[in-house]
Curated annotation (Swiss-Prot):
Taxonomic source organism: Pyrococcus furiosus (strain ATCC 43587 / DSM 3638 / JCM 8422 / Vc1)
Similarity-based family: Belongs to the activator 1 small subunits family. RfcL subfamily.
Entry domain remark: The C-terminal basic cluster region, which consists mainly of lysine residues, is important for the formation of a stable RFC-PCNA-DNA complex, although it is not critical for loading PCNA onto DNA in vitro. An 11-mer corresponding to the PIP-box inhibits DNA synthesis by Pol I (pol).
Record bears the keyword Disulfide bond: no
Cited SMART domains: AAA
Region (PCNA interacting protein box (PIP-box)): 469-479
Annotated spans, Disordered: 424-479
Compositional bias annotation for Acidic residues: 430-456
Complex formation: Heteromultimer composed of three to four small subunits (RfcS) and one to two large subunits (RfcL).
UniProt gene name: rfcL
Protein name per its UniProtKB record: Replication factor C large subunit
Keywords per UniProt: ATP-binding, DNA replication, Nucleotide-binding
One BP term from GO: DNA replication
Molecular function via GO: ATP binding; ATP hydrolysis activity; DNA clamp loader activity
């Protein structure tokens, strides 16, 4: 297992240990104690807002430790956040199964909540019987629906002196001495982010003071994915390889695909390739657990495996090497338009034929068979569903698409001539045949010779409203 990060090793266990946030901590205590005294606050959610590394997440876990709560941590960046909150919200109604530990639902990165899910999350807050705490770097980017339901607690940016004092305390507990000028440089570059400063301190201590300036400067440079791959595959040094994802604007999941793709191009020995893939598979396990549980602290173990684990797997090619983008991303990029067209067709089937998504998917298979074997019927379906030219090509293929599209255009013109609006095509009223407008001279004479009473009866009969019947799809196609 990798060495425990100092950020976790020295994370405060009590609220009183949190650096220079006394006013915020006082508000948090008052809020949580109102729950414990049986008088839940008016606002059942707490929103901790402040810059990165100011102690927001640490507050939640110190609070849970001090008051004996269990923390259920979720991340708002996850697309399935609302689903997870819905699944776990039962924990906000009741205590633990044994009734011994209450739960805190902790929603991190609340400023990344999608507006579409904000109203639903706000409803869940209203139902809560146990505390819900959220954290955000940018308060103004938290959806209004959430802000209105939460009590705001502001965290101030830590000063350079605050950061320095915290670093010195860690060094004393480790029994290590670091030159003062290096500590000053770390504190200065952190911009009040204590978490980043502690990570930098550990990196400098592990890597050696002589490289401290280079290591710290490296944090300020945004890398490309090719530079990151160069660190992984261009060095046998695990410590250096771990720096690969610093300032890389890419998620660990995506970077894993890049590393995975390039292993067979860079390693020479089959056994070493297998060892590198073993590290990749372990990284993938950690990423999967993080996604399922919302515990994104597991990312650090995944990153260690996909960088340092791969770097030390064996001998690599020397000299100029070419890096390749992952086939997975290439396939997804190439199939993006195709997937969008398929989804559009499914939605049109659902709308026009009034069926579920699963039924629509099965129906599309049948429609595809029709498009490949019956061009006339395919043209009718094109008009009925309102398909575009690309959607027709998706269903029939390039060779037949032109013919079907031409027939569909002709059918649309015919429908317009008949006065049938396309938006009414799923349900058309088929009127009973009207009497022929042009009658022969003999028929006109017969009508004139009829008694007046018969004429009156016929007139009343004509004035009666004509009955229509609801057309089916097959009636429409027959036209």
């Amino acid at each position: 297992m990798p060495e425990l990060p100092w950020v976790e090793k020295y994370r405060p266990k009590k609220l009183s240990e949190i650096v220079n946030q006394e006013e915020a901590i006082e508000k948090v205590r008052a809020w949580i104690e109102s729950w414990l005294h049986g008088h839940p606050p008016k606002k059942k959610a707490l929103l901790l807002a402040g810059p990165p590394g100011s102690g927001k997440t640490t507050t939640v876990y110190a609070l849970a430790n001090e008051y004996n709560f269990e923390v259920i941590e979720l991340n708002a960046s996850d697309e399935r956040t609302y689903e997870k909150i819905s699944r776990y919200v039962q924990a906000a109604y009741t205590m633990d199964i044994l009734g011994k530990r209450r739960k805190i639902i902790f929603l991190d990165e609340a400023d990344n909540i999608e507006p579409s899910g904000a109203k639903e999350i706000a409803k869940l807050i209203d139902k809560a019987k146990n505390p819900i705490i959220m954290a955000a770097n940018k308060y103004w980017e938290v959806p209004k629906e959430i802000r209105e339901k939460a009590e705001l607690v502001e965290y101030k940016r830590l000063t350079q002196r605050d950061v320095m004092n915290a670093l010195i305390r860690i060094l004393k507990r480790e029994g290590i001495t670091v030159p003062k000028e290096i500590l000053l440089e770390i504190a200065k570059r952190s911009s009040g982010d204590l978490r980043a400063a502690i990570n930098d301190l550990q990196t400098v201590v592990v890597g050696g003071y002589e490289d401290a300036t280079q290591v710290l400067a490296y944090r300020d440079v945004e890398k490309t994915v090719f530079q990151a791959l160069g660190l992984v595959f261009g060095s046998d040094n695990a410590k250096r390889a771990k720096m690969a994802m610093w300032n890389l604007d890419m998620s660990p999941d995506e970077f894993l695909l890049w590393v995975d793709e390039n292993i067979p191009h860079l390693y020479l020995n089959p056994e070493e390739i297998a060892q590198a893939y073993d590290a990749i598979s372990r990284a993938d396990i950690y990423l999967g657990r993080a996604a399922r549980t919302g515990n994104y602290s597991l990312w650090k173990y995944a990153i260690d495996m996909m960088t340092a684990g791969v770097a030390v797997a064996g001998r690599k090619r020397r000299g100029f090497v070419k890096f390749y983008p992952p086939n997975t991303l290439k396939i997804l990029a190439e199939s993006k338009e195709e997937r969008e067209i398929r989804e559009s067709i499914i939605k049109k089937i659902i709308r026009e034929m009034h069926m579920s998504r699963l039924q629509a998917i099965e129906t599309m298979k049948i429609i595809r068979e029709i498009f490949e074997n019956n061009l006339d019927l395919a043209a009718h379906f094109t008009v009925f569903l309102g398909l575009s030219e690309k959607e027709v090509e998706f269903l029939a293929g390039k060779e037949k698409a032109g013919t079907i599209w031409g027939k569909a255009l002709a059918l649309r013109r015919k429908l317009k001539e008949l006065g049938i609006r396309e938006e009414e095509k799923p349900k058309v009223e088929i009127e009973e045949e009207e009497e022929e407008e042009e009658k022969t001279e003999e028929e006109k004479e017969e009508i004139e010779e009829k008694p007046e009473e018969e004429k009156e009866e016929e007139k009343k009969e004509k004035e009666k409203p004509k009955k229509g019947k609801q057309a089916t799809l097959f009636d429409f196609l027959k036209k």
